[in-house]
């Protein structure tokens, strides 16, 4: 007889007919994302896994390690390369057009210096989404990253490409920048996908309200 049960985030068996999907929503925030990294490590250390993840900006870049189940990786490589100009620096911005060096962050680190576990990522069935801002429409677009291969990494980079400090990323017919501009906390997006319960990891106080960036009019000069 088929066992029609699933397990919730506590590992308890629940009837699939009444199963309520639990999502994990990760806000961005550049290096404030180290807080997110710590939360994700604690969740993994306690074997708490949700049914899906959506990340924005740093939440996307760091959240992929939750799907690949690499405890400590985010904090480890950030500590190792924090002082390396190729990782994040004004020199990188002037030399490459990106304050976070695209080749170093999305090629050298995951493929050579602190290897990302692609096989574990692909074998893990939970869906992982990122959010990015469409430069042409001003709307948020969402992408499910199936393999974390080259094309998926372009979407991840786009999600974390801060305006004024990064080049727009062109992928799949879009020209994209940081998803935090259009949907910094994509809770509503996940609720529409059927995730009725969600763990939301914030990197700002709950009463924080985003104000217009006075430098945004100068973006057209880049």
What are these regions (language model features)?
Residues 1-56, 64-222:
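Patatin-like phospholipase
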């Amino acid at each position: 007889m088929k066992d029609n049960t699933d397990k919730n985030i506590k590992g308890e068996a629940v009837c699939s007919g009444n199963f309520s999907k639990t999502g994990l929503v990760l806000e961005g925030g550049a290096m404030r994302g180290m807080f997110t990294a710590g939360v994700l490590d604690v969740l993994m250390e306690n074997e708490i896994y949700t049914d899906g993840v959506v990340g924005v900006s740093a939440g996307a870049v760091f959240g992929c390690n939750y799907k690949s189940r690499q405890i400590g990786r985010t904090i480890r490589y950030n500590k190792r390369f924090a002082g390396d100009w190729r990782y994040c620096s004004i020199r990188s911005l002037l030399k490459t057009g990106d304050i976070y060096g695209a080749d170093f962050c999305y090629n050298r680190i995951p493929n050579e210096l602190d290897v990302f576990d692609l096989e574990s990522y692909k074998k893990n069935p939970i869906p992982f989404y990122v959010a990015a801002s469409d430069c042409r429409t001003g709307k948020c677009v969402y992408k499910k990253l199936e393999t974390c291969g080259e094309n998926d990494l372009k979407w991840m980079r786009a999600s974390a490409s801060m305006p004024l400090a990064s080049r727009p990323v062109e992928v799949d017919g879009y020209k994209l920048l940081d998803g935090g501009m259009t949907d910094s906390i994509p809770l509503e997006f996940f609720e529409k996908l059927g995730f009725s319960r969600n763990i939301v990891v914030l990197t700002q106080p709950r009463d924080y309200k985003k104000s217009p960036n006075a430098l945004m009019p100068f973006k057209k000069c880049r």
